[in-house]
């Protein structure tokens, strides 16, 4: 049994939760999100909290219901607080700038990389070497941050590239003569 899945997800005041079949909808001050739970997982909304339980005693159902509970908890966090990922750009001449709904990245290529910002995501550039990705959907925020990082992942010799602000880059020594 999943320890995570056993705990009910408490819905704070100011957030309305509805369960329609296998769809869980959350509406809060930051917006509205929904999540479709797998058929092997049973979802109930009672006493101001969402409870998740496996429908069958299979290994698959046991694995999925802890995941479903975590996803529903992310919905509550998203509509109340939101999610944020911070990226740092390291390297000579590497910088970022916003141009309307597009993020322009100068990452050492012969051309600038233009990234279209998807709906529901807000990107701010407080400094030319910092990017903040903010949104209510944790998966979307993480996906956008990962896509931006993939344009120039940090390399281990000089540490140049785009990295998460809390990421540690294992540095290597160069060749010795």
Swiss-Prot record:
Query: Keyword Ribonucleoprotein on this protein?
Result: yes
Pfam families the record matches:
Ribosomal_L6
Q: Which InterPro entries match?
A: Ribosomal_uL6-like (IPR000702), Ribosomal_uL6-like_a/b-dom_sf (IPR036789), Ribosomal_uL6_a/b-dom (IPR020040), Ribosomal_uL6_bac-type (IPR019906), Ribosomal_uL6_CS (IPR002358)
Keyword entries, A-Z: Ribonucleoprotein, Ribosomal protein, RNA-binding, rRNA-binding
GO terms (molecular function) for this protein are:
rRNA binding; structural constituent of ribosome
Q: This protein's superkingdom?
A: Bacteria
* Single biological process term from Gene Ontology: cytoplasmic translation
Q: Known PANTHER family for this protein?
A: 60S/50S RIBOSOMAL PROTEIN L6/L9 (PTHR11655), LARGE RIBOSOMAL SUBUNIT PROTEIN UL6M (PTHR11655:SF14)
Assembly and oligomerization? Part of the 50S ribosomal subunit.
Q: Which family does it belong to?
A: Belongs to the universal ribosomal protein uL6 family.
**Protein name in the entry:** Large ribosomal subunit protein uL6
């Amino acid at each position: 049994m999943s320890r995570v899945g056993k705990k009910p997800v408490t819905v704070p005041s100011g957030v309305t939760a509805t369960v329609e079949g296998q769809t869980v909808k959350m509406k809060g001050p930051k917006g509205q999100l929904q999540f479709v739970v797998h058929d092997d997982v049973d979802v109930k909304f009672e006493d101001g909290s969402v409870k998740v339980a496996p429908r069958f005693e299979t290994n698959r159902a046991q694995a999925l219901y802890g995941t479903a509970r975590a996803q529903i908890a992310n919905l509550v966090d998203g509509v109340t607080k939101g999610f944020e990922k911070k990226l740092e750009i390291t390297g000579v001449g590497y910088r970022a700038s916003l141009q309307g709904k597009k993020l322009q990245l100068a990452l050492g290529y012969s051309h600038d990389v233009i990234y279209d910002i998807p709906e529901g995501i807000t990107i701010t550039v407080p400094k030319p070497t910092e990017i903040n990705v903010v949104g209510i959907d944790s998966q979307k925020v993480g996906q956008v941050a990962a896509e931006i990082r993939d344009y120039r992942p940090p390399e281990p010799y000089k540490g140049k590239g785009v990295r998460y602000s809390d990421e540690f880059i294992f540095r290597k020594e160069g060749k010795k003569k």
